[in-house]
């Protein structure tokens, strides 16, 4: 999915507002995903998935850091996320549908924390951005 210049501006502005809360939002989105889509828990059998778990917080930070990297390299996400794509495709073997589920939960989390900034245009841009990230992460599944 091609991001327009306006989309890139919206994504950078929205992610900039996330700032120091990125890890917390990542963890919240993961918790939301585990509650809303319980089958996603199968990829984390070794995690304590309870609310506020240090393991969920740690993985939420990894998710947020990867998205921060993608925002910083929005014009070259395939190279920026190459190692992460390899990891999810070849070692973790995460079903690609789960990226869509987490993307949805991230959008809900961002909208809940930043309702004034979460305009329809920003929502659409973030949705396109997360779809692009998902596409990159699943590109090595073939």
Curated annotation (Swiss-Prot):
- According to the entry, every stretch annotated as the Globin domain falls at 2-142
A Pfam family matched by this chain, by name? Globin
Enumerate the PROSITE patterns for this protein: GLOBIN
Molecular function via GO: haptoglobin binding; heme binding; iron ion binding; organic acid binding; oxygen binding; oxygen carrier activity; peroxidase activity
Single GO BP term? hydrogen peroxide catabolic process
Q: Which GO terms describe its cellular component?
A: blood microparticle; haptoglobin-hemoglobin complex; hemoglobin complex
The tissues where this chain's protein is expressed are given as:
Red blood cells.
Metal-binding in keyword set: yes
Write down the InterPro entries for this protein, in alphabetical order.
Answer: Globin, Globin-like_sf, Globin/Proto, Hemoglobin_a-typ, Hemoglobin_oxygen_transport, Hemoglobin_pi
Residues binding heme b are: 88
Report residues binding O2: 59
Protein's name according to its UniProt entry:
Hemoglobin subunit alpha-1
Q: Which organism is it from?
A: Hylobates lar (Lar gibbon)
């Amino acid at each position: 999915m091609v991001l327009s210049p306006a989309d890139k501006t919206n994504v950078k502005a929205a992610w900039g507002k996330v700032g120091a809360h990125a890890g917390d939002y990542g963890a919240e989105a993961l918790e939301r995903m585990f509650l809303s889509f319980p089958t996603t828990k199968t990829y984390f059998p070794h995690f304590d998935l309870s609310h506020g778990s240090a393991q969920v917080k740690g993985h939420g930070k990894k998710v947020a850091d990867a998205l921060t990297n993608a925002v910083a390299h929005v014009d070259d996400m395939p190279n920026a996320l190459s190692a992460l794509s390899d990891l999810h495709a070849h070692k973790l073997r995460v079903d690609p549908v789960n990226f869509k589920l987490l993307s949805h939960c991230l959008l809900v989390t961002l909208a809940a924390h930043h309702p004034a900034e979460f305009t329809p245009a920003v929502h659409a841009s973030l949705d396109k951005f997360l779809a692009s990230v998902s596409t990159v992460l699943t590109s090595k599944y073939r």
